[in-house]
């Protein structure tokens, strides 16, 4: 008997290496703005220290009778706290306080299954639980796949910026 279950949970210290592998597997993929040093263990530890890193676990029962299970992290998202992003003048003061969702990653084997959207929904719900009025994030202007994925949520494009050597569109949405 095979059974598959996916769930989104807060990441733990034990997940650090697997999350780092998930980030690194994104490098070199089309439109990925990340480099060898970002995101790295520093960002993972920063996010864990603020209880702001969440992962989707794909749990697949190998043998239900024996109770053995193999869990795998297939996606991650962070609630970021980046002063450079927060200082951008495009964010609406009427929607303050707002927070940024970032470092969204989906394992290549699980892409095109709407997992990124599920992670965004979870992230927005978590921000609302924490008392934020809005969510904002940056998307590389050339990342057509991400732009398409985010379009279904009705985010407002509130500006453009160049940070970290990348051209970004600035998105914001009331929660």
Stretches found by the model and what they are:
Residues 2, 162-175:
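Terminal substrate-recognition subdomain of acyl/acetyltransferases
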Residues 6-21:
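A short beta-loop-alpha structural element at the N-terminal edge
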Residues 13, 24-109, 120-121:
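Acetyl-CoA-dependent GNAT
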Residues 14-18, 39, 144-145, 166:
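Short alpha-helical
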Residues 106, 112-125, 148-152:
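Conserved acetyl-CoA-binding loop-helix of GNAT-fold acetyltransferases
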Residues 120, 127-138:
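Conserved GNAT acetyl-CoA-binding A-motif
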Residues 137-147, 163-167:
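Conserved beta-strand-loop-alpha-helix junction that forms the acyl-donor binding cleft
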Residues 151-160:
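Conserved acetyl-CoA-binding loop of GNAT-fold acetyltransferases
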């Amino acid at each position: 008997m095979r059974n598959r279950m996916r769930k989104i949970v807060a990441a733990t210290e034990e997940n650090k290496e697997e999350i780092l592998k998930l980030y690194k597997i994104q490098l070199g993929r089309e439109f990925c703005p990340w480099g060898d040093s970002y995101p790295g263990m520093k960002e993972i530890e920063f996010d864990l220290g603020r209880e702001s890193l969440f992962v989707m676990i794909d749990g697949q029962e190998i043998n239900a009778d024996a109770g053995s299970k193999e869990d795998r992290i297939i996606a991650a998202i962070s609630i970021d706290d980046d002063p450079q992003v927060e200082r951008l003048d495009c964010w609406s003061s009427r929607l303050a306080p707002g927070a940024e969702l970032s470092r969204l990653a989906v394992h290549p084997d699980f892409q095109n299954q709407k997992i990124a959207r599920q992670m965004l929904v979870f992230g927005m719900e978590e921000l609302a639980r924490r008392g934020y009025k809005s969510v904002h994030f940056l998307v590389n202007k050339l990342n057509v796949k991400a732009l398409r994925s985010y379009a279904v949520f009705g985010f407002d494009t509130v500006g453009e910026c160049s940070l970290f050597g990348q051209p970004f569109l600035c998105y914001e949405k009331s929660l």
